[in-house]
Swiss-Prot record:
Pfam families: PyrI, PyrI_C. Coiled coil: none annotated. The gene is pyrI. This is Aspartate carbamoyltransferase regulatory chain. Contains catalytic and regulatory chains. It comes from Buchnera aphidicola subsp. Acyrthosiphon pisum (strain Tuc7).
Length: 154
């Protein structure tokens, strides 16, 4: 008989980002500026997962992520789920899908890009090449980079 015990405290109301790949939880906290709130945030790192082997989880009380925020999670956590909780019950489960653009959360690898020298939010257009590799094109400097290159700059 398997005992199912919560390893991260339940929240009464808010958003739960589950199935985050291990070691990505802290990165999401800073990139999405989740810590710039007065809301209580609980994070579980390197937890056991049947689906991923290991996972991270983030719970944000009294905050419901927008569809735009959820979809931008997909660049880092394509198999994540976002659960909306009300009165300790799951009321909605959302699966992120890659948006056409990623705004504000990524840094352009081009050191000459205007976004690296002025207070301008970054913006990338997601593109797929002929080999189905995901590339990101900066809206400002118009340079195109492999997804892996952009994510390594963060």
């Amino acid at each position: 008989m398997e005992i199912n015990k919560l390893q991260v405290e339940a929240i009464k109301s808010g958003s739960v980002i589950d199935h985050i790949p291990e070691y990505i939880g802290f990165k999401l906290l800073s990139l999405f500026r989740f810590t710039e709130t007065e809301k209580r945030i609980t994070i579980g790192l390197n937890l056991p997962s049947k689906k991923l082997g290991r996972k991270d989880i983030i719970k944000i009380e009294n905050t419901f992520l927008s569809d735009e925020q959820i979809n931008q999670l997909a660049i880092y956590a394509p198999h994540a789920t976002v659960n909306y909780i009300n009165e300790y019950n799951l009321v909605r489960k959302v699966f992120p899908t890659l948006p056409k653009t990623i705004d504000r959360i990524l840094i352009c690898p081009n050191s000459n890009c205007v976004t690296n020298h002025h207070l301008i939010n970054s913006s990338f257009i997601l593109k797929e090449d002929q080999f189905f590799n995901m590339n990101l094109k900066c809206k400002y400097c118009e340079k195109e980079f492999y997804k892996k290159i952009v994510l390594s700059c963060q």
